[in-house]
């Protein structure tokens, strides 16, 4: 099949959604399909054997309309030659679904954009139960300039309504987890297929085994991600303090909570090594060496790429049980799940202090990762593309 993958985010500068799209592209190519990536992300014109068409991105006011138009025009050019257009994110999806005619159109939903204007389901630092009118007014408080606030809620309502209407036009909708699928099933969009992200354990092991470029402690607990409230940055040091591992915390990431974390660490006597954002290769090398990966996320995680790659490397994981995380990790088999900060600290303590726990989780993680391999998932993607699923 000739498959066009459309996405706003893609390597080399990308988070989990971009790298997951790359993994899908390479796996489809490896299965013999003709794959082209169309993206507004900056970078080169190929990703391994997969050609990449880079479009001019945009920011600022009216970004949604302009980006949707950019994708629509680009996809209209490839539509005649493609068997499938598979959109990977909100704006690429809106562009693909605005085509008047074309090939089969599939949309993957990787976060909460169809049900939450901000795509996070977080408001004022806490989980938002639903986008009711009252909750919307609370949500915009402090987020937008005062002069724009009266228009915000009507616009948010229109935005969510139009996204739902667009999704209903898709030939197939994929959710990356059952947690996301449950949200989508509250909308009138038809059937939703749950298809998780792909991880190629052979590739991540090869990268992780390459020579290190970061200078890291001999033994450490690792955090990877944005230092933001929804990622649990405020709970990192309290969890480490509760765990009493005696190990330093390595933070590969940055964000608005950076200074708070450093102050907490100083107060608690926790040694922190924070080189900031790291290339994916350095992240994988650090994962392979870490005594444990701590994952304190407080928002409803759709399906974390960090956790997927940690599983593939057999890294022992201590994670907060939010969103789709329990769909990746079976408690006490492929990782340890926690419900609060003290529980997370206890999980870290068990991993670091008990070699038998660490050994069991390493084996369970590597075994669990096989469920997300290209060989396990590509046939299911092909069935969706053919319309037989």
Predicted regions located by residue number:
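Membrane-proximal helix-turn-helix segments that form the acceptor-binding/catalytic region
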Residues: 129-172
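A short, well-ordered alpha-helix in the C-terminal region of glycosyltransferases
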Residues: 357-371, 380-383
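A conserved mid-protein helix/loop that constitutes part of the nucleotide-sugar donor-binding site
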Residues: 19, 23, 219, 223-242, ...
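Conserved acidic donor-binding segment of nucleotide-sugar-dependent glycosyltransferases
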Residues: 331-342, 350-356
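Short hydrophobic beta-strand element within catalytic cores of glycosyltransferases
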Residues: 316-319
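Carbohydrate-associated surface elements
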Residues: 179, 198
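Short His-centered aromatic/hydrophobic patch
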Residues: 87-92, 109
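Nucleotide-activated donor-binding/catalytic signature segment of Leloir-type glycosyltransferases, i.e.
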Residues: 262-281
């Amino acid at each position: 099949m000739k498959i066009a993958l459309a996405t706003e985010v893609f390597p080399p500068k990308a988070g989990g959604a971009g790298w997951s799209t790359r993994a899908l592209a390479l796996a489809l190519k490896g299965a013999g399909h003709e794959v082209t990536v169309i993206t507004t992300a900056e970078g080169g014109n190929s990703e391994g054997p997969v050609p990449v068409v880079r479009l001019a991105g945009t920011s600022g006011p009216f970004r949604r309309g302009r980006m949707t138009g950019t994708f629509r025009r680009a996809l209209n050019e490839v539509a005649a030659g493609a068997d499938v257009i598979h959109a990977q994110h909100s704006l690429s999806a809106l562009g693909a679904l605005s085509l008047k005619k074309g090939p089969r159109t599939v949309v993957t939903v990787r976060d909460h954009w169809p049900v939450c204007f901000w795509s996070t389901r977080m408001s004022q630092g806490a989980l938002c139960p639903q986008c009711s009118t009252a909750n919307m007014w609370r949500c915009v408080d402090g987020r937008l300039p005062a002069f724009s606030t009266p228009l915000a809620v009507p616009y948010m309502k229109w935005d969510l309504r139009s996204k739902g209407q667009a999704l209903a036009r898709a030939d197939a909708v994929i959710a990356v987890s059952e947690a996301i699928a449950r949200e989508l099933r509250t909308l009138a969009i038809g059937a939703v297929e749950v298809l998780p992200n792909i991880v190629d354990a052979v590739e991540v092991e090869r990268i992780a085994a390459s020579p290190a470029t970061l200078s890291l402690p001999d033994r450490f607990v690792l955090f990877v991600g944005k230092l933001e409230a929804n990622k649990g940055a405020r709970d990192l040091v309290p969890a480490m303090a509760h765990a009493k591992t005696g190990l330093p915390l390595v933070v590969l990431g940055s964000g608005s909570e950076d200074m708070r974390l450093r102050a907490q660490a100083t107060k608690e006597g926790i040694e922190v090594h924070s080189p900031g954002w790291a290339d994916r290769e350095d992240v994988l090398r650090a994962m392979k060496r870490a005594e444990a990966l701590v994952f304190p996320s407080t928002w409803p995680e759709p399906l974390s790429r960090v956790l997927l790659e940690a599983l593939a490397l057999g890294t022992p994981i201590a994670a907060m049980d939010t969103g789709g995380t329990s769909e990746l990790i079976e408690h006490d088999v492929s990782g340890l799940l926690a419900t609060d900060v003290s529980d997370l600290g206890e999980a870290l303590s068990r991993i670091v202090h008990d070699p038998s726990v660490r050994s069991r989780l390493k084996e369970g993680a590597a075994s669990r990762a096989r469920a997300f391999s290209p060989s396990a998932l590509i046939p299911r993607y092909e069935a969706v593309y053919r319309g037989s699923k």
